[in-house]
Amino acid sequence: AKARKVDVIRGYGHFLDPNHLEVEETTGTSQDKTGAKKVVKFRHCIIAAGSAAVHLPFIPQDPRIVDSTGALELRQVPAKMLVIGGGIIGLEMATVYSTLGARIDVVEMMDALMQGPDRDAVKVWEKQNAHRFDKIMLKTKTVGVEAREDGLYVKFEGEGAPAEPVKYDM
């Protein structure tokens, strides 16, 4: 950000008017308020709220199970990988690992991938990228994961669900 002359401010903010934002700053990556307030004047404002991974309660703790941050730190490419969630971040990870040689399945409980963007844009993306994945299971939920020595066995429910658990390396 500094190389592009962008100031990053972390905290809780509210707009005072169309060109001013008051921010109550927080410490580091935590949400603890420092008490310091800053008023920022701008012509154009980008709000990058970030995201946090959802940890599903039925998924066991296992080093082969990672969130999107952990997926960026893998030292080797798994042979077969499941991506839970067909949103932008999940599909970004799926595309990266497919390009690196992993066989990828994507499971999404909604009826389409990427719920936020324009549907026509998503269709273009799907047409250009669907070949990268072994399976895209829509209207399907992950309902169980069993971590065994030889792999992760995943159970699904829904329209695109396989009848038996499927084995994944990650």
Locate the predicted segments by residue:
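A Rossmann-like FAD-binding core segment of flavoenzymes
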Residues: 7-10, 14-33, 40, 101-170
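A structural motif corresponding to the C-terminal end of an alpha-helix
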Residues: 1-7
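Generic detector of short alpha-helix boundary/capping microenvironments
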Residues: 1, 33-34, 82, 160
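Glycine-rich dinucleotide-binding loop and its adjacent helix/turn
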Residues: 44-102, 107, 132, 136
